[in-house]
Amino acid sequence: MSDLQSIADRVEIEALRGEFTDAVMMRDYDRVASLFTPDAAWRMPNIPVELTGQEEIRAFGERVPRFVDYLVQTTHPGTIQMEGDTASGRAYICELIHPSDGSSELNYAIYHDRYRRTTDGWRFAERVYEIRYLDTSPLAGSAPPTADGAR
């Protein structure tokens, strides 16, 4: 593989991670599911949730609004190790979560990822969410009122 191909692969994987965060923030669960391979696993052991395949991932996402009023997720670049048509890496996450039960969460976490090149581009073969810091103190702020048609 040429150096140029390696650079292109890294850019595509970084774009995949950004697309995931955007899809989660926009509550676009069809798009979230499409970012995974058909046989992918998404594991969140601290919650605990384990999902296998695009349909389980989509269905979980569609349930999220029942127990989360809003969340803000930011993803920070991590590492990517290329291995031909597969790769592994880590992305660093900060989340503010306001569950519908009125509680609050601020966490810092790591996504441990495995990626696979497909005919549609790079996709997640596995995402494992590891919370490294959790603060359940009440959040001082809130989501602002939304304008008509805003998401």
Region spans (language model):
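Short, cysteine-centered beta-strand-loop-beta hairpins and adjacent loop/turn segments enriched
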Residues: 96-104
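Short, low-complexity N-terminal intrinsically disordered segments enriched in polar/charged residues
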Residues: 1-38
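Short, surface-exposed beta-strand-loop junctions and turns on beta-sheet-rich folds
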Residues: 95-97, 130-131
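Short beta-strand edge/turn micro-motifs at domain boundaries
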Residues: 88, 108-138
